[in-house]
Amino acid sequence: MPAPTPHIPHSAGTSLVSCAELQALLTQIFLRHGTSAEVAAVLAANCASAQRDGAESHGIFRIPGYLSTLASGWVNGQAVPQVQDVAPGYVVVDACNGFAQPALQAARGLLIDKARRNGIALLAIRNSHHFAALWPDVEPFAREGLVALAFVNSMACVVPTGGHKALFGTNPIAFAAPRTGGDPLVFDLATSAIAHGDVQIAARAGHTLPEGYGVDRHGQPTCDPAAILDGGALLPFGGLHSSYKGSALSTMIELIAGPLIGDLTSLESGAFDGGANLVRHGHDLLGHVQQDVDFLGVGVALGHALHHAPHPARPFA
């Protein structure tokens, strides 16, 4: 999902690097902290692409989290995913307590083949760790001509509508669809009001958040990101009066990415503790090949309409 490179002012002592250079540097960092070459390459590509596309909360900001989980032994950086060909339209991968992205990489070819043969296929990843951007998981499928939809649950850090205790993860959804003559249509969004990483960035910078984003440890609304991180929780997306929408979608993802595939819910995995012990969770990815209608043509038309929908004074980036 490439975005135009913004102009970034820099001073003496700093320098700009290309995405390829950043990816190579990150690969070396992961290798030095004990991952296999395969795992290092996949994680570096994910972080570099997020940084390139402007998602700072999921780019190099995530590196300390990756390294702390490796140093503590909580995640196995040498894990070799076990791919199971379960049924004509179903693939299961045991990530073996490794990161989810290498597990997806190991099963991608089989999932694409099944989707093309059967029109649709589902991939379930169990026993994995995933706290990166989700769109890099789905975009490659769209570039192969498939429609892809992914769900993942995470650490319990979101209060359901009307509740007072963190029950859900940020539980993102990612979608990608091919377009003739252009980049795929891709989105990746949390079902919380804001990504957890963005709260961490706001706290570091001393910024406040808009109303309706979180609560403190007493369940009271707060705009202070530090209070949210210090025993508080995020709220579902939807705003002060419609957060039930985000809460409902998050419930769905808990079930789809948890017990439906034999894995844990966010609550079962344990709440985020601010340290290296990030939770294990499940990850679902659905690939679909549409052969009965001019899907690509419709996608081009819709993409064109979306691009020209904003007011000229507020264009898309």
Briefly describe each language-model feature range.
Residues P2-P9, G13-S18, L22-L25, L255, ...:
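Catalytic-core signal marking the mid-to-C-terminal active-site face
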